[in-house]
Swiss-Prot record:
PANTHER family: LARGE RIBOSOMAL SUBUNIT PROTEIN BL17M (PTHR14413:SF16), RIBOSOMAL PROTEIN L17 (PTHR14413). Keywords: Ribonucleoprotein, Ribosomal protein. The keyword Hydrolase does not apply. Belongs to the bacterial ribosomal protein bL17 family. One of its GO terms (cellular component) is cytosolic large ribosomal subunit. InterPro entries: Ribosomal_bL17, Ribosomal_bL17_CS, Ribosomal_bL17_sf. GO terms for biological process: translation. This is Large ribosomal subunit protein bL17. It comes from Methylacidiphilum infernorum (isolate V4). GO terms for molecular function: structural constituent of ribosome.
Amino acid sequence: MRHQKRTHKLGRDTQHRSALIANLAKELIEHKRIKTTLIKAKALRPFAEKLITLAKKGTLHARRLVVRKIHSKKAARLLFKEIAPQMQGRIGGYVRIYKMGNRLSDGAKMALIEWTEGQVPVENQKAQKAE
């Protein structure tokens, strides 16, 4: 039985899974919103929230830890300069996941994952495009 097992294995070994999560986090930081499978989004959420918690500290040590986790100085710079200041008033829940239905090719459940602060919600964007 898999009681109290918190990790999503995603059908990959440990190094592949950690590289996948780091790359997804880097893309989320750079693009502010990404479309991926629901399970990958659920696996990414705690990783991304821990990155924001580190970035809100703003120390040199926190910056080095973030760079070590996501392997990108550019993304770390964006995280510290743009995203973390928007989240200063928020205690947790930095990431929002929208379910988007199934992918046509293989039927995988898809999701949209984005930052909660500083974003125009998906429904409002559709309404703006219609006008």
